[in-house]
Structures are given as C-alpha cells and as structure tokens.
Amino acid sequence: MNMFSKVFGTRSQREVKRIMPLVEKIESLRPDMQKLSDEELRGKTREFKKRLEEGETLDDLLPEAFAVVREAGKRVLGMEHFRVQLIGGIILHQGRIAEMRTGEGKTLVATLPSYLNALEGKGVHVVTVNDYLAKRDAEEMGKIHEFLGLTVGVVLNDMKQDERRAAYNCDVTYVTNNELGFDYLRDNMVIYKEQLVQRDLHYCIIDEVDSILIDEARTPLIISGQSGKSTKLYEACDILAQQLERGEASHEMTKMAAIMGEEVIETGDFVVNEKDKIVNLTEQGVHKVEKFFNIENLADPENLEIQHNITLALRAHNLMHKDQDYVVKDDEILIVDEFTGRIMPGRRYSDGLHQAIEAKEHVKIKRESKTLATITFQNFFNKYDKKGGMTGTAVTEEKEFRDIYAMDVVEIPTNRPVIRVDHEDAVYMTKKEKFNAVVNAVVEAHAKQQPVLVGTITIETSELLSRMLKRQGIKHNVLNAKFHELEAEIVSQAGQAGAVTIATNMAGRGTDIKLDDVARNACGLMIIGTERHESRRIDNQLRGRSGRQGDPGESRFYISLEDDLMRLFGSERLMKIFTSLGVAENEQIEHKMLSNAIEKAQEKIEFNNFGIRKNLLDYDQVNNEQREIIYKERRQVLDGENMREAIYKMIQDTVDTYVDMCFSDDVDSEEWDLNEFNGVLTPIIPIRPLTDESVKGKKRDEIRHELKEEAVKLYEEKEAEFPEPEQLRELERVVLLKCIDSKWMDHIDDMEILRQGIGLAAYGQRDPVVEYKMSAFDMFNEMITSIQEDTLRMLYHVHVEQKIEREQVAKVTGTNKDDSAGPKKPVQRKEIKVYPNDPCPCGSGKKYKQCCGRKNKA
C-alpha cells in the first residue's frame, strides 16, 4: 500500500465512505417499515411506480425501496440484509462491480437493485453461470419479489420459445449468460415478429462477473447450421495423424525471426507449441501428407481443405485431452468448460475440431457446421443501458473491466473479519511426490475431523487422487464433469466434520459450504490446490471457498516443477538450478525465487489472455457496427413497416450506380458501351434495353431520369397485378428477409477469412486492424449492394400465383462455445476473393469495380 492510500484509504474505502450516508438513511427507515402490514408493504411497489411516473428518479426512491426489500427479505426468507449488503446493492445499482468475499450473500444483495430497477417496467436480467443457480435463485430470491408484487421468470436450457418469452416478459428474469446471448442471436434470425422472445436490453446484474466477462470472453457465441460437406476426410486424416511422428523445434518461430530469415531446425513430421496450442507440419511431414493423399503440392489452393483437416487431426491427438477438455458419453463428445469443469451439453467446437475429436475417439462423426450468427460477450453485454456485477475476485482484472466494459470495481468490506490462514505454496520436484504430499495432508486433516476440499484442474487428476485416497481408506466425494447432477448436494456437505471432497476447478461455485460445530473447532475447511491455475484470480476463488462469514479455515497450494504452468511458462534457468540441487525424494522445496517464478508465470499468461480478448474485441468491434445495421434493418422488416419507400430508394440507387459506372458526359453518347449497361441492369430491372437511337443527343442525367421513371412505372404495374396491396407489401418483407439473411451469413464467413489472412499485413509494417477495417468497409458496401440487387431482381420477376410464405434461409443445428485455442479457419473458397477497390486481376491497372467487376455484376 502506498503512502497516499495509507493516509486517505484505498479508492474502494473512499467509495464506501461516500455511500455510507445512503446506508444510514436506509437504516433509519427500518422502524417505519416494521410497522407496515404485509399488504401495506406490498402497496409500496404501486406507490413507487406512481412516483416514477410523476417525475421522481430511481436514485430518489433508492433509500425507501431498499428498506422495503430489506423488510420483505426478513419476513419472507428470515434473512435481513446486512449493512455491507446494502453497500453492495448501491454499487450494483450504480452500474459498477461489487467485489464481495465468498459467503457474504451476493445472491441476497442482487434483490435490492433488481427490485429498484424493475420498477421502471423494462425488465431486469439477473445473470448466472449455470441453469442450477438460475433456477435456485429464481425460486429462493424470487419469493421476495413476488411478495412485493413483481413477476419473476427463469430461462433454462431446455425451455421452448413461448416459455422463454413469458420469462423475459417478467419484471425480474434469472438466466444464464449463454442462454441470454443465444436468445439475442436467435431473435435476430426469426422470420415473424411474434417469434421474438426478448425485450430491449435494459439492466442486468451479472453474478460471477469475472467468470462471464473475463474468462468466457475469449471465444464468441456462435449459432451454427449444418454444411453439406462429407465427413470422410476427417476419418482419413485421423488415420494419417496416428502414423505421423511428433518432433521438436530448435526454437520458437517469431515474426521477427521470420523477417530476419532465421531458420528453425525441426525433427519429426510435426511440432507442437503447447503455449499457443498450435500444431505445425515439418517439411518431412508435408511430404508424407502429399504421398498419403497422392497430391503434388499441399500448399496449392485446391488442397487447403486437406491442409486444414490434417492440422485439426493433429490438434485433436496432441492438444485436446480426454477427461480434461472433453468427455465421451453415449457415443458423443461433450465439451468440458475449462473454467468450471462442467459439461456443456449441446456445445460443439467450431471449424471442424469437434469432428476431428469424434474421429479420434471413434464415435459417430456429425457434419461440420456453418456459422449463421455470432457475437462476443463483450459486445453483447455492452448493449445493456446499464449493468452491474458481483464476484469474490475482480480487483486483479480491474483495468480490463474499466477499459472494455466501463465498469469500476469496489471492494466491499466483509461483515465479519476473514480469519482463514493462507499457507505458503508447497513445492516438489515431481508430480508423484506432490500427489503423495497432498494425500498425506488429507489423511492428517481427516484424522482430526477437519473437512478438506481438494481443487484439481483436470478430471484425470481428480480420479488419480480418488484412487490414492481409496488405497488409504479415506471416504470421499468426487465432483467433476462426470458427476454434474450431484454437484450442489456434494458441495453443500463439504463442510461437515471429516468430509473429504475432490472438485475439478470451480465446480460447485455459487453453492455455500457451511461448517458444522465439530468442523469449526477443527480449524475449519482446509483448501488444497493441486496445481496453480493460469489465472491468480481462479486460485483466489478456490481459496475463497473457506473462511466465509468469519469462519476459521486454511488453504495451501501443492506444486511440482513438472506442472504445465512451470514447464511451459517458468524460467528454464530457474528450473535447471533446482534440478541440479539434488533435492531428496518427497522433500519440500521452499525458496523466494520459486514463489516469484510462479507469480511471474501467472502474470505472463494473464497478460497473454488479456491480449487475446482485446484483439478479439478490436476485430469484433468492426463486425459489431455492421451487425447493428443489419439487425436494425431486419427489425424494421419484422415490425411490419411499409417497405415500399425502401424498395423505391433501392430502384433509384441501382439505376444511379450503373448509370455512373457506364456513362460519362465527358464522352459522346455514341461512344457509350450500351451492351455493357444493358447486360448489368436489365437482369435486375427488366427495362427496355437502351439503343443508340434512344440515347442519341442526351446527357447522362437525362437518361438517368428516364430510366428511373420507367423502373418505377414497371414496379407500379407489378403492384397492380396483386388483388390486395398488402400482398405485395408482405412479399417485399419476405424477399428482403431472405436476401438479408442469405447475404449476411456469407458475409460472416468472408469476414472470418479476411481476418485470418489480414495478419500477414504485419509483415508489411501495416496495422492489421486498420487494414481489416478498410477491407471490411468495402465488403460491407458490396454486400448491401448485393442485397438491394437480389431483392429487386426477385420482386420484378415474381409471379402472382406463387404463395407468399416466409422461411428461414438456413436451419439452426446447434450452438457453439469454442473453448479451444488457436485461430479459427473457416471453409475456404477455391477462387480468390477480389474486393471493389483492389487492382483488377486482368492487369488493366484500373480498380476491380471499374473494370471486370462491372461485367461480373451482370
């Protein structure tokens, strides 16, 4: 703590001090609220809504509203909000993050701002990390809201469309982050307004905000449909991947090394970079692949699919581990969430990786998916008018919360002092010695009836420790992705005297561990971490399971020099020093240098992960602006707006585009290329083709005016063919939706291809993000033009006897939350994409749009 903080207090302490007068005001209203009958207390909700209509603000109502909720909590649940919980509620209402220790009652805190903000009638979303917590909180905390006359809903994974709509229409809705994001995307794919389930995004309270906005923000939400590709190539690549030999690289290839022409000496058929989770074929490996598939050059454009799929197969075998990244259950590959250790049913890795794992595990290979809609959590949650968050650990990522989400973090003091003892890390040379030490520590604690919670990173480790404890005769519970259903029950019993629980990562987060009297007298819950996580914050979350509400407790991490964190990110020099010390077997190593190395390794990874998330956001910001325009256009169509004016504007714009492209007043009309003009415009708008006679002696604008008049007249004739004007209006909406959806889905793929290729701009000393923005702008304009032209082409050529029905462009087959690292590489097109402002490939020296681009439009 610096001198300023010692004198004036930390920023959080100053913020809490500023809020205290409000807390005192809420406290002072307590006697008045106690005097009210249940009916009078409920009547306060109607009174608050009326006062809002008369011009008062939520801030004006806050002290009374919080006092009402506090009294309702006491009457309904027998739980009265502590002063520190009132502080937390105020922070959440202000759109900030309240860092509250485990066991401080974050769930109860959320009832305060959710009630206050629900009074506006626009809906409040309380966001949790899984269905169990959403359902539990809706049932328990929802009683307070219902007692006060508000409606409460919950959205669960298996709910139908009408059930979701009813839940979102409630005053307070409990929902998981994934369901919320996917419902937003699905709402922007519906073809009738009645199919929408969500209202506008007004205010949300995010529980475990660090898990949702930081940990899960590295990968976007993706809704996918099935592509028509065969699965045979995955099987062939899987067979080949098992025949290839893993080698080593002399050093890592960096961009600077590539520019300087440094050579990397590689052995074997492929090398694996575990840090960045990337697999690369060596020259020897490339030759083997070419021989296997009987092709001349793997790098040829027509072989991109083979190149992509063999890389996926190698990743599946060398970087994706069974019972760590995924489990096999009922002939299916199920993803395990890397942050919680929970199974994510229905989620599939994107870009063919899931199919590669299916081939590896010899289960039925499902067809590859095509991205239909996608959004990042950063951009989704930034759509809310206001958002607040709660967690036990946020200060380490405060800068990211402020920079990306414009939310600052305020540490809320605990209701009772924390008396948990956090011991120094116990470090061993090998994993075997480390696990022996963990088992000895569990046996020792168990002997004195002290409950133990052992945190592991992988399912494999939890099962190994389980076997070792069985040999020692220690009765215990295992909580990992395989036993998901029993999660809450097992966690709630973990504080009983003599209980031993092994939990993968933060499984069971959100469920309180309460101690019995015997356990409390035996020094409380003992937390044992079997490995340091990549993030210090997740280590702190594990520690925070012990010592709730002033309970006693202990924590210690057990580490070996063979752990992934030390092996991949620790200093090699340091590792060599300790290896050469000749430490006796099972002897614990203690050294300040080692503690610093662990801390530095974690900081390195945190910085790296922040870079990944920031990079994702920089690129997705461009996509987000385009997505906003497209979704706004779709919503106007869904709202049943009269599209006649929009169609007329498309007619004018299309005529303008081709007149300006083909004609010039600087050139005599006799020299105009009428064949080119007729070839591009008449397939879209069936006007009479222009002839030398019809343009003779006329200026460009005169031609323009005549063409527009004729095009509008033709459209009016088309209108007259319909018995009812509304029939054509509905047809316009049907055609527009079809064209928007079809072109937007192709555009998503094009943008991903562009993003993967744009990284090469860095070699030319150009900023890849700037290059991406410029190219994306051209592509978007090209897509808009294409939507307009396809819409007009279909409307001008439609026949009245055709039945008008809306239909989805592509069928949704699933959702995807890809937690795999490494860049996503979409299906490549064989032809090279040429953008409007690129030099024309024919070599004329003109821009593509002014040369061959014209002809291709036809």
Predicted stretch roles:
Residues V454, I502, W744, F780, ...:
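Hydrophobic, well-ordered secondary-structure elements that form the walls
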Residues E27-P31, L617, D778, D838:
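Positions in alpha-helical segments
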Residues K448-S462, D639-G640, D692-K696, P841:
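Short, Lys/Glu-rich amphipathic helical modules
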Residues Y326-L334, T340-R348, Q549-G550, F557, ...:
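Extended, charged helical/alpha-beta scaffold domains that provide interaction surfaces
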Residues K830-K849, G853:
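Short Cys/His-rich zinc-binding micro-motifs
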Residues M1-G582, K632, Y648-K649, D653:
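Conserved P-loop NTPase motor core
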Residues M1-N2, N178, G814-G822, N837:
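Compositionally biased, intrinsically disordered low-complexity regions used as flexible
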